[in-house]
Amino acid sequence: MRNRAGNVRGRACRSWEGGALAAGLLALALLCGCAGRQAAPAPTPDPAGEPASAPVPALPKASPETVARHEPTPTPEPTPFSIAWITDTQTMTMYPSLAPALLPTFRWIAQSREEYNTQLLIHTANFVENGWNPLHWKRINPAIALLEGELPFLPVAGNHDVAKKVLSYEPYLAQPFIAWQAPERQYRGGEGYCERFTAGGTDFLVLGLGYLSVNEAGLAWAREVFRQNDDCVGILAVHSYLSYGSDRTSELTGHGALLRQEVVAPCGNVRMVLSGHVKGNALRIENFDDDGDGQPERQVVCMRHNYQQNRYPDQVGYLRMLIFDPVSRAVSVLTCAPAQGSFTAAPDRADEEHFTIENAF
């Protein structure tokens, strides 16, 4: 079956034609020592509380026609591809001594697009320490500008971006990268955003929802977009989802509990949730029984990754490459710091920095 853009759509892959990229990504997974590792599912705990958000007006329903596809060129064959993921860059905008890491980090993301077959960069918020401080935006915007015309970008607003002075999207929505967005894919002018693309023979819908929009109207918009694009593998990108816990289990934040109940659970195509906010790394894998037959049909992978200078004094410019294998349906996670030339896991954090998740999409 083919979708409206003429790209092959489907979840099953017939074969994998090897090549330099495929071999390289497989070698990378083996080098990381992560092939076949999977965390155990975690039970659903009582969520921690989180401040309530002000209500916003609901938007008209989204439709597949309004969720237009973006560059890069789709890859209909089952070829490995990647999504780049960065979060909580706030300390690099706050401290002049750390700000020089921003340009090389974003430059590497843009320049490595072909090598990793990168389809998208997701930023799960807290771009800056204080969204009302123009100097902080001045430090990061030149780095983000390197992506323009090079790589699709899905930003999410966090509490530091919109809530340090008053609860308002005003400083965030004034940033240049919001103007890159297609209006038909925005929620309330950039408070939320979605990207639909085809890679490895599979259609994906990635949806980002800002920190102040985790409320009745914002949740309804997210739910409707996922449901109108139920032919896609869904990825939800938010700032706050996983709370404190061990590196392999985690409770939910207040926002996380709402998002799980109102979006993740009812939308049967959501397979992954990415978040930051809380410092450190966490992984939570949960199974959902969507048809009520007593047997889980859907695995949802939830990850948090947040390297900040005050948690890891020598670690700045960290990001994750999520490497999708469309044949095995596994995702290999590579945590790296290109600005430092670091692509190997720290010995004391190897299991949480380089690993593979089976049945991930």
Question: What is each model feature region?
Answer:
Residues 30-33:
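C-terminal motif of bacterial Sec signal peptides marking the signal peptidase cleavage site
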Residues 35-37:
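Bacterial signal peptide processing site
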Residues 46-135:
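N-terminal active-site segment of His-dependent metallophosphoesterases
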Residues 77, 320-361:
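A short C-terminal boundary segment appended to hydrolase-like catalytic domains
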Residues 80-93, 202-212, 235-237, 299-306, ...:
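Active-site-proximal beta-strand elements of phosphoester/diester hydrolases
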Residues 85-87, 120-126, 152-159, 209, ...:
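Active-site neighborhood of phospho(di)ester-bond hydrolases with catalytic His/Asp-centered motifs
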Residues 133-220, 266, 283-305, 317-323, ...:
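Extended active-site neighborhood of metal-dependent phosphoesterases/phosphodiesterases
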Residues 213, 219, 227-271:
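Active-site-proximal segments of metal-dependent phosphoesterases and phosphodiesterases across multiple
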